A protein has these predicted regions:
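Charged catalytic cores and adjacent phosphate/nucleic-acid-binding surfaces used
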Residues: 1-12, 21, 25, 101, ...
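Residue-level marker for buried hydrophobic side chains located in beta-strands
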Residues: 6, 37, 84, 144, ...
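Ser/Thr-glycine-rich phosphate-binding loops at phosphate-binding pockets of nucleotides
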Residues: 12-13, 35-39
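Short, conserved active-site loops that position catalytic residues or coordinate cofactors/metal ions
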Residues: 37-49
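Short, histidine-centered active-site or binding-site loop motifs used for metal coordination
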Residues: 42, 113-115, 204
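Extended substrate/RNA-proximal surfaces in nucleic-acid metabolism proteins
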Residues: 46-174, 223, 227-229
Length: 243
């Protein structure tokens, strides 16, 4: 199967990225990307300084800017799918996340710092809350793990993690900015990803235009671990969401 060119982890100047959303879109067109997601940070933790997305007004402006770019792509018949995303820091307070995120406004949500069993329980509580807020089940966003470090769970019980990811259809991100997290030392982890049929996708964690298309190595590693079917599962979910 010929896989599309994916980068579902991009930061703009709404957080710690260097470019405007419109500049990212224009460059992505030139690079022949097929799918991109703008996923700026949302946090009230120690790293709150990195993001302006700390109130509903700014989030509304952020989403509107993405909408304008989406309309441009559609009206000009450009074959680039742009997703409205966000990257949520799981060391943020539960109150902040629940208050500021209107779940059906987003196409894709990444979670960073899922590091313990306690964090799984914390995130599951938030997902349950979101599911009570959603008006149409089909409008629930795609969920993924940003630059996930498998090491904690590798030393303990992988089944708890895998069952959680399977239950909520949360994908694993092969992130080209963190290649150590998909190195061969984690081969046992990726065997479980394959066994549990956990979706996988690609994100570059791009903060400037220089690495918007750094998807070759992640794709090579997906093939190395024989996870092509897992990537197909993700693309099928993505297409259902988009089309």
């Amino acid at each position: 199967m010929q896989f599309p060119n994916l980068n579902l982890h991009i930061h703009s100047n709404y957080s710690d990225g260097k470019q405007k959303i419109s500049e990212i879109v224009k460059k992505s067109i030139k690079l022949n990307l097929d799918y991109i997601a703008i996923t700026d940070h949302l946090t009230d933790s120690w790293k709150a300084w990195v993001s302006t997305l700390n109130n509903k007004l700014t989030i509304s402006e952020y989403l509107e800017e993405i909408s304008i770019c989406q309309d441009y792509l559609i009206s000009n018949n450009i074959n680039l799918i742009l997703l409205k995303g966000i990257e949520i820091d799981l060391s943020s307070t539960e109150q902040f996340i629940k208050k500021i995120v209107t779940i059906d406004e987003f196409d894709l949500i990444l979670f960073e710092y899922l590091q313990t069993y306690e964090t799984i329980a914390y995130l599951e509580n938030i997902i349950h809350y979101w599911k009570t807020q959603i008006k149409k089940p089909l409008s629930f966003p795609i969920l993924g793990l940003a630059h996930f470090d498998p090491s904690f769970f590798m030393l303990r019980n992988l089944d708890i993690l895998m069952n959680f990811l399977k239950k909520y259809n949360i994908y694993f991100e092969f992130n080209s900015s963190y290649p150590s997290f998909y190195s061969p030392r984690y081969e046992r982890f990726f065997k479980r990803i394959k066994e549990y049929q956990i979706p996988v996708a690609i994100g570059c964690d791009s903060h400037n235009q220089n690495n918007l298309n750094d998807y070759d190595e992640p794709l090579d590693m997906i093939q190395y671990y024989n996870l092509e079917r897992n990537l197909e599962l993700f693309i099928n979910t993505l297409d259902l969401r988009v089309f």
